């Protein structure tokens, strides 16, 4: 049933038509979403995401510092080792024995010229000799220090004791070394390349390096200057490079990572 109503002017009107006219008469608010503003919004969002990504990468790189260290050299194979490190743009520190330095002076000079760090590993690498008395470790390190300085002009305070500073480096031995400014460097990743003479040592290093890095610690990797290590080293260097690890050298002004006795040190005699 159609109901007719009387308008204020006295004319009859259809309410549905009146409503439609009222709707048509209402102004519609328009939003200006132009293409230029939309593009600007997208660009800003991209820039914010890029900045977040760059910050994350910077933090990631900062926390992924690795120290490669090589003991017992130099050797007839050290030149190949340096070639490999340079090929992968890796830095490293070499703890060397006095007699070996004298036998391979050119490669030691090359280390220095190419920005590698050099340190002392003693003279004898014989536990019964280097740990025979409180001043014996100091004597060997002073001799090694002089050999390096006379050859290269570099005054290094970096030392690594044969077999590490535990258990044979007693407290009195440590005091003598400290008084002469030596920095005793041990390690927190033992490659065991002296026993695992194949790529098993690489797998071990990769696992322990990743674990330490995730924990926010910088891996100090113990390796040896010998043919078996050099043979499988490319696998390790390639992994470090692809996973954005940054290698650095040890320096005289760093606080060293040193094993603490905690009741474990004793005299060998």
Question: Over which residues does each language-model region extend?
Answer:
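N-terminal pre-catalytic segment of deacetylase/amide-hydrolase enzymes
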Residues: 1-69, 74-87, 207, 239, ...
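Active-site beta->alpha N-cap acidic-glycine motif
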Residues: 37-132, 136-150, 236-239, 255
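Structural recognition of the beta-strand scaffold that forms the well-ordered cores
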Residues: 67-69, 92-96, 117-122, 157-160, ...
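Active-site beta-loop-alpha junctions enriched in small/polar residues
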Residues: 73, 97-99, 123, 162-164, ...
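Loop/helix-junction capping segments adjacent to catalytic residues or to phosphate/diphosphate-binding pockets
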Residues: 75-76, 101-105, 167, 195-196, ...
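Short low-complexity, flexible loop/linker segments enriched in glycine and/or proline
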Residues: 108-110, 134-136, 199-202, 262-266
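Alpha-helical scaffold elements lining the catalytic groove of polysaccharide deacetylases
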Residues: 126-151, 165-216
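Catalytic grooves of carbohydrate-active enzymes
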Residues: 214-251
